[in-house]
Amino acid sequence: MNPKRILLVCTGNSCRSVMAQGLMQHMLQQAGLDAVTVESSGTFAIAGMTPTRETQRVLWEAGIDCSHHRARSLTPEMIAGADLILVMEQSHLPEVLHRAPDAKGKTHLLKTYGLAAGEPVTNPNIPDPIGKPMEVYEVCFMEIREAVERVVRSLGVASE
């Protein structure tokens, strides 16, 4: 698969998918894969909300500015326009498929996408840090970074 448009999905589009979008855009640029567009949305997002301060902070510390981001609520049009949809937890899968049943083949968990067959995963979900201490955001960021690195590596191989 060589996607041109990736959609990252969480619940509120203010923490996890924002981190994943910022990291993925940054890593894709570094890898010279600028032709890939990365967007994010939330299954229950309040449109126009800014990322949490904690999200902005962990991204800022990684050299990524997300202050311009505004939350978007997931729509069937967003799903139809994406080549690859990566969700943060298993509960997001039926939310995507309810809006667009034909998206099943292109919708995956971020944390397990690109793993080798049989590679073990302790928890396929990336827990929502909203309302939790900064340390929880930092752990969430590290989990997302590891998963995004794997996705970007798989895209780099696919584009060669």
Locate predicted features.
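Short polar/charged helix/loop
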Residues: 1-160
